UniProtKB/Swiss-Prot annotation:
No icosapeptide-like peptide is cleaved from the C-terminal. Coiled coil: none annotated. It comes from the Eukaryota. Residues 1-26 form the signal peptide. It holds the Pfam family Hormone_3. It comes from Cavia porcellus (Guinea pig). The keyword Phosphoprotein does not apply. The keyword Secreted applies. This is Pancreatic polypeptide prohormone. Keywords: Amidation, Hormone, Secreted, Signal. CDD domains: PAH (cd00126). GO terms for biological process: feeding behavior; neuropeptide signaling pathway.
């Protein structure tokens, strides 16, 4: 009975620690506004703290953070082929679609060099 009670207390303590630890690792707290009657030195210190706070929140994140959303969960990305419209790309406005597998005027193929689709005019079948 005492072993069960000890295990339950350890489980409760572990759960509380697990719930409280992420709060300590979260975003920094916003600096407290010193008030309208603050001295110029206090306002300068507040401005510096606010600048650090904003820089911390808006800094670019590289590596693992770039692969996760705001909650720390992995971001599931669909491939371009699974996106609406498939992997087909159309030429930008004003550029004709290339024919024969080469780009315009014999240059290497571009991403929009493709097989005909609904967006391009197809020969009518009579």
């Amino acid at each position: 009975m005492t072993a069960t009670r000890c295990c339950l207390w350890l489980l409760l303590l572990g759960t509380c620690m697990a719930l409280l630890l992420p709060e300590a690792w979260g975003a920094p707290l916003e600096p407290v506004y010193p008030g309208d009657d603050a001295t110029p030195q206090q306002m300068a210190q507040y401005a510096a703290e606010m600048r650090r706070y904003i820089n911390m929140l808006t800094r670019p994140r590289y590596g693992k953070s770039a692969e996760e959303d705001a909650l720390g969960l992995p971001v599931w990305r669909q491939s371009h082929a699974a996106a609406p419209g498939g992997s087909h790309r159309h030429p930008p406005a004003g550029l004709p679609a290339a024919k024969g597998g080469t780009g315009v005027s014999g240059s290497p193929p571009k991403p929009w060099d493709c097989l005909p689709c609904r967006a391009h005019s197809l020969p009518s079948q009579s």
